Amino acid sequence: MRFQLLIILLSFLLISCEEEEDFSQPFYVDENGVTIKAKDWVTVGTTGVLNGITYTAVDNIKISESDFKSKYPEIIELKQLVTTLVTDMSIIAGDYMIFGSFDDFKSIETWDVSNVTSMAGLFNTCNCFNPNYVNIENIPDLTYWDVGSVTNMSGMFYHIYGGAMFNQDISGWDVSNVTNMYRMLMGSNQFNQDLSSWDVSKVTNCDQFSDWTAMWTLPKPNFPISCN
């Protein structure tokens, strides 16, 4: 009997040790092999080293400061940001234009956007997909982004400079919670992807969604409303 109790106790201790949270490592790589995420207990300003890179958890304010580099000199590259706590990414790309370089812009593909609800104007008038400003190898691949919480994508790619070069297959995005797609892809005049699989049942505004996209011949989203 005592032996059985000892076995049970040892088993319990073993399970407890296995389930103990590792508070020495605040960040981890998502199962997709790309996205860098923060653990549930992480707060703004938490830092940690993962695969040789020092990361910092940021929030809406830190990610959208126009004088970002002067306020946060410890963060020298975009790839050092862990964005799990960010909920609003409206027009942030414009703030990064002052950096004068897109050498590390590709690293935004590692950003965790799973809690973001607004991407309104995210890349509005951004040079970030234009090979005249960005080396082809530094253009970010946005197909890994988990946009399932986003409700506002209005103007997300509106008149991005070099918009002719934005033609990524974003058909796998979960846009089922988006209500506003006003001018989302307006001006991306080389975009040509099949977005007919998108669940746009909640969209209430898609006006001018695809204006000035002359090359777009593949199926577009099946909106439940008119997108004049």
Residue ranges and their predicted role:
Residues R2-I8:
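Sec-dependent signal peptide recognition
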Residues L13-S16:
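C-terminal motif of bacterial Sec signal peptides marking the signal peptidase cleavage site
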